[in-house]
UniProtKB/Swiss-Prot annotation:
GO terms for molecular function: DNA binding. The keyword Transcription applies. Phosphorylated by BvgS. The gene is bvgA. It comes from Bordetella pertussis (strain Tohama I / ATCC BAA-589 / NCTC 13251). InterPro entries: CheY-like_superfamily, Sig_transdc_resp-reg_receiver, Tscrpt_reg_LuxR_C, WalR-like. It holds the Pfam family Response_reg. This is Virulence factors putative positive transcription regulator BvgA.
Amino acid sequence: MYNKVLIIDDHPVLRFAVRVLMEKEGFEVIGETDNGIDGLKIAREKIPNLVVLDIGIPKLDGLEVIARLQSLGLPLRVLVLTGQPPSLFARRCLNSGAAGFVCKHENLHEVINAAKAVMAGYTYFPSTTLSEMRMGDNAKSDSTLISVLSNRELTVLQLLAQGMSNKDIADSMFLSNKTVSTYKTRLLQKLNATSLVELIDLAKRNNLA
């Protein structure tokens, strides 16, 4: 049976709730963890069929985990379960290789619907995400500006908005201070901002803090 699940989320209560729901529906939860590095380790060792993954996790963010899982070539599907705004993250997750995206603000039973669809070979994303990809958007809105950021740049922006220093960000992402400074410079350029205050305002305006 293709029903082995790995849960990666840094909220223990939510992990427990998802585990109970999935086991009730016949899925076998073979592992769970609160960070990206351990998540990758478990995925390599136990090779789940489905990874239920949050984006804002410590040590290695969810988008990076998706990319690394893809590079490993493991026969698994990734379902993102996150509180991050779908307007900014759903398309990015799809492009990174995720098969589904569910917002934590939805009824948690939506996770089961998504898991079943994903394991049946379908993708499961908000309808607006797919329609936006078909139509495109030429307006220079915040979301358009943010959409051109790399996954790493987006993570740095979020951490800056949370008040973290360059050193804290460097430690969190396993980067040098110089590399973080380079990312900050790129963010200022790409987001048409003139100061760190403007960057943080933009991030908070778009629920990235």
